[in-house]
Curated annotation (Swiss-Prot):
Pathway: Cofactor biosynthesis; NAD(+) biosynthesis; iminoaspartate from L-aspartate (dehydrogenase route): step 1/1. Specifically catalyzes the NAD or NADP-dependent dehydrogenation of L-aspartate to iminoaspartate. The iminoaspartate product is unstable in aqueous solution and can decompose to oxaloacetate and ammonia. Pfam families: Asp_DH_C (PF01958), NAD_binding_3 (PF03447). It catalyses: L-aspartate + NADP(+) + H2O = oxaloacetate + NH4(+) + NADPH + H(+); L-aspartate + NAD(+) + H2O = oxaloacetate + NH4(+) + NADH + H(+). It comes from Pseudomonas aeruginosa (strain ATCC 15692 / DSM 22644 / CIP 104116 / JCM 14847 / LMG 12228 / 1C / PRS 101 / PAO1). Its EC number is 1.4.1.21. One of its GO terms (molecular function) is NAD binding. Belongs to the L-aspartate dehydrogenase family. This is L-aspartate dehydrogenase.
Length: 267
């Protein structure tokens, strides 16, 4: 059985814990949350058949088989970098954080120093394998369009573009590079950043973000072309009830990645 420590226990982390309840090969031994949230999270997880320990930091000398980040961008700095340097392999959900200048290089250096490895999870998007394979032969263009319910953009710069609460028809709230999208919309940047890292990079990947009052799904569209030919992907993801900014597929992506580490055959 893999010994797993998870950073964060919000909508994504809680969903992962629930799905792992009946998997005999996978167990989250501990979750790491801010100190002032420990009691609340411990109470919330008490109903699980196998509740994990709730900690504010990884105890000195403790070496789990895997550390899984489900907590947002700050957790990369606080927990993932030190874990990699200590030789602990890490899975990362908050790929948008890697748009920060120099962070990719720091993560790579920490992993090399510790002899460990970092795996970036696809989360809410698919076709990452096809995109990264196409890059080998030469990519020419990659465009990502993200369409979400208007309410999912509350608390973002989209509020300065239009009145999201009174929006009557779909409105483009951003059109530019993936790097700029990640800077302005960090909580919605994971898909764009993942596509960029797999393909043409943050500056050459084009991003369009749309607020749609008639949509009840998070719709991700990817168009790519190059020496390989081209492809178009449309993925309609149901948002998590606990967080409309996040697709439920993100939770399933984490569980799938953990299964690939635990089981004899992975795909």
């Amino acid at each position: 059985m893999l010994n797993i420590v998870m950073i964060g226990c919000g909508a994504i982390g809680a969903g992962v814990l629930e799905l792992l309840e009946n998997d005999p090969q996978l167990r989250v031994d501990a979750v790491i949350v801010p100190r002032d949230s420990e009691t609340q999270v411990r109470h919330r997880l008490a109903s699980l058949r196998r509740p994990p320990r709730v900690l504010s930091a990884l105890p000195a000398g403790e070496r789990p088989d895997l550390l899984v980040e489900c907590a947002g961008h700050r957790a990369i700095e606080q927990h993932v970098l030190p874990a990699l340097a200590q030789g602990i392999p890490c899975l990362v959900v908050s790929v948008g954080a890697l748009s920060e200048p120099g962070l990719v290089e720091r993560l790579e250096a920490a992993a090399q120093a510790g002899g460990s490895r970092i795996e970036l999870l696809p989360g809410a998007i698919g076709a990452i394998d096809a995109l990264s394979a196409a890059r080998v032969g030469g990519l020419e263009s990659v465009r990502y369009t993200g369409r979400k319910p208007a309410s999912a953009w509350l608390g973002t710069p989209g509020e300065t573009v239009c009145d999201l609460q009174r929006l009557e028809k779909a409105r483009v709230i951003f059109d530019g590079s993936a790097r700029e999208a990640a800077r302005l919309y960090p909580k919605n940047a994971n898909v764009a950043a993942t596509l960029s890292l797999a393909g043409l990079g943050l500056d050459r990947t084009q991003v369009r973000l749309i607020a749609d009052p008639e949509s009840c799904e998070n719709v991700h569209q990817v168009e790519a072309s190059g020496a390989f030919g081209g492809f178009e992907l449309t993925l309609r993801g149901k948002p998590l009830a606990a967080n409309p900014k996040t697709s439920a597929l993100t939770v399933y992506s984490v569980v799938r990645a953990l299964g690939n580490h635990a089981h004899a055959i992975s795909i």
